[in-house]
Amino acid sequence: MSSIGVGIITCNRPDFFKKCRESIKEEWYDSIVVVNDGKDPIFDSRSPVIQTSGGEGVGKAKNIAIEYLLEQGSDYIILVEDDMLFKDNLFEQYIRAYKETGIHHFMFAYHGPANKAGISRGK
């Protein structure tokens, strides 16, 4: 059976992290890791926390999560940031869509005001 690994990336937003973590149900994944790229410590009794030296950047934090989850034997890796909340098991939906389409990476159509049409072009 395939295993699902989840990496949560957080940086100096403990309230966001707490809400994000609480929205991810334990039955949705097999392995989980939190990578904290902020200066303030994050504690989570349900998952390991890897602390960077702080300010390494989201890319490096995601690579740390991927490396950890691969070491855990995860077949599917889902990376989330601390400002994401889940009310349904989106992870299974992503995996199903991957199997049906062959697309390995899904992007959100909207990720902040700068991605609205015209704004990113300075209009």
Question: Predicted regions span which residues?
Answer:
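Active-site regions of enzymes building and remodeling cell-envelope glycoconjugates
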Residues: 44-54
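Conserved catalytic core of nucleotide-sugar-dependent glycosyltransferases
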Residues: 87-88, 92-123
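Glycine-rich, basic loop-to-helix element that forms the pyrophosphate-binding segment
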Residues: 53-69
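Short beta-strand-to-loop acidic/aromatic patch adjacent to the donor-nucleotide binding site
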Residues: 74-85
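Short, well-formed alpha-helical segments that are part of the catalytic scaffolds
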Residues: 13-26
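Cell-envelope/extracellular polymer assembly enzymes that use nucleotide-activated donors
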Residues: 3-5
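A conserved acidic beta->alpha catalytic loop
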Residues: 35-44
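Short hydrophobic beta-strand elements that form part
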Residues: 7-8, 78
